[in-house]
Amino acid sequence: MLLTLTFNFQFMEKGEMIKVDYIGKENGEVFDLTVKEKAQEEGLDTESMNFEPINILLGENFVIEGLEEALMDMEVGEEAEIEIPAEKAYGKRDSENMETFPEKAFEEQGVQVRPGEQLMIGGQRGRVISKGSGRVKIDFNHPLAGKDLEYWVKIVEKVEEDEEIAEGILSNRLGHGELEFDGDKVTVVHRHENEGHSHSLSDEFKERMREEILEHTSFEEVEFEE
């Protein structure tokens, strides 16, 4: 007897954008989440947090490797609990990512560093781990490097509209700014100022973002306004 089976599973594919809710934990402690109710349970300051699902463009390194692999095997509406080893999260801690700088280099710029502080140096975020004898040691490893992580995730929906896909790319890659749409053209408006100094986007960054928008939407032109 021949049986006819029908499967309605629709797993994710690279190049698709999805909205995802998640709770990330390390050793049982929450380090990031998008679910307000859980944040309130943990006693976190919900006033300063954003509780919207994040946009993830699959195949473009929007999230860590282990999380993306799990999402690829899920479908819209599905929830899952995932354990991710350090190798597929933020990698192992690397001693080569620790550097020592002369303390006077910071003093000359009017910066007083203290252990535990985070600084941006040469476009990299680092944490001051020690200070003494005229030297400052900075750790450029990701704070979660070397850590096994646990995630609860839910794929909320698939993002289909071109404008929303472009907005998702902007949010992930830049974190601020806005988009203006005019027919087949997208303009990325970037006016980010910090302490009176304008921070321009590098040509490499612009080209990468331009390629992602053109590849994953039907827009034909991407411009930048700074």
Task: Give each language-model segment a name.
Residues 5-226:
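FKBP-type peptidyl-prolyl cis-trans isomerases
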